[in-house]
């Protein structure tokens, strides 16, 4: 092991550490960071070399953050990244600094983003917040309106998590939806992601995603937002149901094919009986 450590350069060590951090399960960033910190044993090298991994993790995970003085949380996503550690809160029309390691928001300031489709963004946000409140106990959503490849685009992001470290499991749901504001009809593109980590009696991770495409009739802002939510709700309900059914099928078939519930004799071993036989035999020999 010592020879291997001597062969690894600082750059290689940081690269390996960054991979561990980026792939940390939901709600377990701090645990992975602390373990990597002990392994690397060089705080300056870790902070400087793996800073991009801290940022990438938060962007990928849609990390929610509370801004002091504002009621609703906002998601940290690539769509709100203004550069230099600053992010956009489109609902409150502010920007703020975000510490990717501490996961803290500071220095909120007024910020006027693109307002060409602000009325569309607001309508979608209002409808999406009502939907998230109904379907996600701990859900957070952020809706952006911005120009993408020259087209006015609405981007809606949803995040919901349950961190149950005391019960040895953590999980997160993420979904991202996009459509361009064009006359008559447009294409809705979505991606749904689920990640769950269970580690009480073993170490099992569920990592799943699904791509969605559907057509959306574009009329006025409010009606279009309602139709958009119908697409989102139908797709996410179908995905959740499919995941549940798939795991029931896996429990009934795949898992049984991987491991026998009973040994080859088709009978359970009575360990108490075996123990009593052994004790009885030892007593006879005494």
Swiss-Prot record:
Tree of life domain: Eukaryota
Keyword set includes Phosphoprotein: yes
Pfam families: F-actin_cap_A
Sequence positions bearing N-acetylalanine: 2
MF annotations from Gene Ontology: actin filament binding
Keyword Transit peptide: no
Keyword annotations: Acetylation, Actin capping, Actin-binding, Phosphoprotein
GO CC annotation: brush border; cortical cytoskeleton; F-actin capping protein complex; membrane
Any one of the GO BP annotations: actin cytoskeleton organization
Cross-referenced PROSITE patterns: F_ACTIN_CAPPING_A_1 (PS00748), F_ACTIN_CAPPING_A_2 (PS00749)
Modification sites for Phosphoserine: 9
Assigned protein family: Belongs to the F-actin-capping protein alpha subunit family.
PANTHER family according to UniProt: F-ACTIN-CAPPING PROTEIN SUBUNIT ALPHA (PTHR10653), F-ACTIN-CAPPING PROTEIN SUBUNIT ALPHA-2 (PTHR10653:SF2)
Assembly, per entry: Component of the F-actin capping complex, composed of a heterodimer of an alpha and a beta subunit. Component of the WASH complex, composed of F-actin-capping protein subunit alpha (CAPZA1, CAPZA2 or CAPZA3), F-actin-capping protein subunit beta (CAPZB), WASHC1, WASHC2, WASHC3, WASHC4 and WASHC5. Interacts with RCSD1/CAPZIP. Directly interacts with CRACD; this interaction decreases binding to actin.
Task of the protein: F-actin-capping proteins bind in a Ca(2+)-independent manner to the fast growing ends of actin filaments (barbed end) thereby blocking the exchange of subunits at these ends. Unlike other capping proteins (such as gelsolin and severin), these proteins do not sever actin filaments.
Protein name: F-actin-capping protein subunit alpha-2
Organism of derivation: Rattus norvegicus
The gene coding this protein: Capza2
